[in-house]
Regions:
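Phosphate/nucleotide-binding beta-alpha loop and adjacent structural elements of enzyme active sites
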Residues: 1-256
Length: 256
C-alpha cells in the first residue's frame, strides 16, 4: 500500500501534513478514548486496520460487500479522502467524491489520487440548500452535520458554519456515464433523506452499498427495517453491525 502523506485538520482548523499510516502503528482504541489519538487517526484505522466482524480491514468492506478491481466507487461524505485512497489502493477505476464542508474539502482536494473526482456538494433527496456545521473542534471530522441534524442530536459548540448546495441522489446516478458499482455513505444523519429518495432502478444498479447509519429520532429503526426489506426484495444480502449503545451502526449490502 502506498504510504501516502495526508493533509489533515488540527483542532484549531489549520491544515497539517501527516503520515497517518505510520501513526497507526501505535494506535489503540484505548489511546484514542484517552485523547492520545484524534479523529484523523481513527479514520485511518477504520479504513485500513479495522478487522472486526469479518471485515477485510475496512468497516465499509465486509463479507460480499467489497471493492473489486475496476469498480467505479461513489463516496458520499468523503471527508479528507481516506476512503477514496482506500478505494484506489483496492483497484477502483474511478472514485467519485462528494464533500460539502470547506475545511475538509480543501484537504480532500490536496489528498485525492489520480482516479478520484471531487465535488463540493451535500447529497440529499433533491436539489436545495442547507447549513452545515462543525462542532467541538476541527479534528471532530465526523461532526460536519446539517443544521437539522444538529437540532435533532444535541446542543454542541459550533465552531464552523456554512450554507452548502445539495445535489439530489438520483441526479448523481443520471449525471455519470460510468455505472456505479460500490456506494459508500457516511453523511452524518442525512441517510434517511437519500435512501428514501433514491430510485429502485439506481439501487438495483449497484453491486454493493455500505453506509453508516445514525439513529437521530425515535422511529429510525422502523426506517432502517423498511430499507433493509427493500434491499432484500431487490436481491441484496446484508449485515448490520451496531456500536456502543446501538445508535451508530454500519450496514453492508451486496449482491452475489
Amino acid at each position: 500500500m502506498d504510504n501516502k502523506l495526508f493533509w489533515t485538520l488540527s483542532a484549531e482548523g489549520n491544515e497539517v501534513l501527516r503520515d497517518l499510516s505510520k501513526e497507526n502503528e501505535k494506535f489503540s482504541i484505548d489511546g484514542y478514548n484517552k485523547g492520545d489519538f484524534d479523529g484523523n487517526n481513527y479514520q485511518w484505522y477504520e479504513m485500513f486496520h479495522h478487522y472486526d466482524f469479518d471485515d477485510n480491514g475496512c468497516d465499509y468492506e465486509r463479507y460480499g460487500c467489497y471493492i473489486k478491481e475496476g469498480d467505479v466507487v461513489l463516496d458520499l461524505g468523503a471527508n479528507i479522502g481516506v476512503f477514496a485512497h482506500r478505494a484506489e489502493t483496492r483497484g477502483a477505476s474511478k472514485v467519485i467524491c462528494f464533500e460539502p464542508v470547506t475545511p475538509t474539502f480543501n484537504c480532500l482536494i490536496k489528498n485525492k489520487g489520480n482516479k478520484t473526482l471531487v465535488y463540493k456538494n451535500a447529497v440529499g433527496g433533491k436539489q436545495g440548500f442547507t447549513t452545515f456545521n462543525i462542532h467541538t473542534d476541527y479534528t471532530h471530522i465526523g461532526g460536519g452535520t446539517s443544521h437539522l441534524q444538529d437540532l435533532n442530536l444535541s446542543n454542541k459548540n459550533i465552531i464552523h458554519s456554512e450554507k452548502v448546495i445539495i445535489i439530489g441522489i438520483n441526479e448523481i446516478f443520471e449525471g455519470f456515464e460510468s455505472k456505479i458499482n460500490f456506494m459508500k455513505m457516511d453523511i452524518e444523519g442525512g441517510e434517511v433523506d437519500v435512501l428514501t429518495s433514491i430510485s429502485d432502478d439506481n439501487l438495483n444498479s449497484l453491486r454493493c452499498l455500505s453506509a453508516e447509519f445514525h439513529k437521530t429520532y425515535e422511529m429510525f429503526d422502523e426506517f432502517q427495517q423498511k430499507f433493509i426489506d427493500r434491499m432484500v426484495n431487490l436481491g441484496f444480502k446484508y449485515f448490520v453491525l451496531y456500536y456502543g449503545d446501538g445508535r451508530l451502526r454500519t450496514l453492508n449490502f451486496w449482491k452475489e
